[in-house]
Regions:
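Core beta-strand elements of the Rossmann-like FAD/NAD(P) dinucleotide-binding domain
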Residues: 2-4, 170-180
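N-terminal Rossmann-like FAD-binding beta1-loop-alpha1 element of flavoenzymes
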Residues: 6-30
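Structural detector for helix-capping/boundary residues
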Residues: 11, 149, 179-180
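Residue-level detector of alpha-helix initiation sites
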Residues: 12-13, 35, 188
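Conserved N-terminal/central alpha/beta ligand/cofactor-binding core
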Residues: 32-161, 166-168
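Residue-level marker for beta-strand->alpha-helix junctions and adjacent short loops that shape enzyme
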Residues: 152, 171, 188-189
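Glycine-/small-residue-rich beta->alpha transition segments that form the dinucleotide
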Residues: 178-180, 184-189
Length: 189
């Protein structure tokens, strides 16, 4: 039986970024079904949308809602937009090298966007970001990583998750207990 403060399932951008932003006094376990690099975030070639300035909020919101056929959670979209520059700044601080144009960044206009607000790392944005996040996570003394481990079930009692049942590469099942469990499995898990 293993006990952690936080259990993170998934090693894409969301799982890794979460680990980097949790308190260093928390014991964290990150679990991935393959290797650290074996995820869709690593393969992503597209860019990241960022609010360019305050005047861009409404157009960015409308572009995103329209692209989602207005089925989006508007409050969640607004939060994403409002936090986008802070996230980009954090990624830059972690060493992510976005494409430059002159002294600034090279913003592109793609898909449903009405303005140029997309940042890239050549055509390997996902690989660039994930590689930098992986390197930073590996430096954390409070983080353990289980590769080649599959989530079998969540350990739930009442209305609270207490961890997960994992299967390792050899097929052995083990319970991992945590005060908090974060599912960062992406679109396909």
């Amino acid at each position: 039986m293993r006990n952690y403060d936080v259990l993170i399932i998934g090693t894409g951008v969301a799982g890794l970024f979460a680990a980097l932003n949790l308190s260093s006094d928390k014991q964290i376990l990150i679990v991935t079904k393959g290797t650290l690099e074996d995820n869709d975030s690593f393969l992503a070639q597209g860019g990241i949308c960022v609010q360019r300035d305050e005047m861009d909020f409404e157009p960015f919101l409308e572009d995103t809602l329209r692209a989602g056929h207005y089925e989006n959670n508007e409050a969640a979209v607004a939060t994403m937009i409002n936090q986008s520059q802070e996230i980009i700044d954090d990624l830059i601080d972690l060493g992510v090298a976005f494409d430059k144009k002159g002294a600034g960044f090279s913003y592109t206009k793609e898909g449903a966007h009405s303005r140029a607000r997309i940042l890239h790392c050549k055509d390997m944005t996902g690989k660039e970001i994930n590689s930098k996040l992986i390197a930073q996570v590996k430096e954390l003394k409070n983080v353990s990583i289980f590769e080649n481990s599959t989530l079998v079930d969540l350990l739930v009692a009442g209305d609270r998750c207490h961890g997960a049942v994992l299967r390792d590469q050899a097929g052995k099942l083990s319970n991992v207990y945590a005060q908090s469990t974060l599912l960062a499995t992406g679109g396909i898990g």
